[in-house]
Amino acid sequence: MINCKLINFDCAQELVSVCRRYDEDIDVICGRYIIDGKSTLGVASLVGNHVSIEINTEDG
């Protein structure tokens, strides 16, 4: 799990761009919300917050 802060929309857009390069499911977690890391609108809704990034692989 990786922790970071989404400072602005450009950071959110860059995170989505990186997530889309991978086939695995990537979740962006903020409190009780779990957002698909490949969703621009979803990740953009978390701008200004500290988030955790979790990569879900078949290995667990």
Each language-model region and where it sits:
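Alpha-helix N-cap/helix-start and coil->helix boundary motif
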Residues: 9-12, 60
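Short amphipathic
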Residues: 1-6
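Amphipathic alpha-helical interaction surfaces in cytosolic regulatory modules
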Residues: 11-20, 24, 33-49
